[in-house]
Amino acid sequence: GILDSLKNLAKNAAQILLNKASCKLSGQC
């Protein structure tokens, strides 16, 4: 459903942000 799609989008966005943050913190960008 729509709610499931939104939840998946939110999860993906959060994962991308976490990856970018950890990348910057570790200096491996």
UniProtKB/Swiss-Prot annotation:
Please name the GO terms of the biological process aspect recorded for this protein, alphabetically: defense response to bacterium
- Tissues expressed in: Expressed by the skin glands.
| Location within or outside the cell | Secreted
Could you tell me the keywords of this UniProt record?
Answer: Amphibian defense peptide, Antibiotic, Antimicrobial, Disulfide bond, Secreted
Mention any Pfam family matching this sequence. Answer: Antimicrobial_2
Keyword Disulfide bond set for record: yes
User: Does the record bear Ribonucleoprotein in its keywords?
Assistant: no
Tell me which domain of life the UniProt entry assigns to the organism this sequence originates from.
Eukaryota
Q: Name one GO cellular component term.
A: extracellular region
Q: Which cysteines are joined by disulfide bonds?
A: 23-29
Q: What does this protein do?
A: Antimicrobial peptide.
Report the family membership: Belongs to the frog skin active peptide (FSAP) family. Brevinin subfamily.
Protein name, entry field: Brevinin-2Rd
